[in-house]
Amino acid sequence: MAVDADRVAGLAHRVVTEHDPKTVPVTEFLGACYDAGLSWVHFPEGLGGLGLSRGLQAVADAILQGAGGPVPLGLNPMGYGMAAPTVREHAQSEDVKKSLLRPLATTEDIWCQLFSEPGAGSDLAGLATSAVPDGGEWVINGQKVWTSLAHKARWGLLLARTNPDASKFKGLTTF
């Protein structure tokens, strides 16, 4: 683990030296972090990570933020916290993963969550928005409210009911 921590620290020092967060645009700095594998060190190489232990993220963050770098989770909370792991695990191909993860990591693409609904609020068991398959697509019917960062978001994680016959706590799918 010490060797891995030294590797992460070395990469982080290189990023802040070559892309001083106090003088370069945020997107450039975060792009350099992604390219170095420091966005999520536990993600696979080539997807913003190094394939290392999640605990080593603290090593990278201390150096990057100590040099004045931004806290990405604060800039794109749904992107970093929920969308990135979902994309990593469920996107259809490596190309799709790369096309979504890098702009998410740089905050060029902000993500939001589409969960809360009128009449149900944040009670997901009361969710009424439906998703019905239609050929190779899904038809979504319903509405969402209180969508933080929707005004900045390019992408959203939508929660919809896909099985109306299931109990109210089941039959939900994220799109």
Question: Residue ranges of each PLM-predicted region?
Answer:
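FAD-binding glycine-rich core of flavoenzymes that anchor FAD
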Residues: 67-71, 86-117, 135-136
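FAD-binding core of FAD-dependent oxidoreductases
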Residues: 70-85, 105-114, 144-156
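A structural signal for short hydrophobic beta-strand segments in well-ordered beta-sheet cores
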Residues: 129-132
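Short, solvent-exposed loop/turn elements at beta->coil junctions and helix N-caps
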Residues: 46, 116-120, 145-146
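A short core secondary-structure module
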Residues: 141-175
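Active-site-adjacent elements of ketosynthase-type condensing enzymes
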Residues: 119-127
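Amphipathic, small/basic residue-rich leader segments at the start of a protein or domain
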Residues: 1-78, 94-99, 103
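Conserved protein kinase catalytic domain
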Residues: 61, 84-87, 101, 157
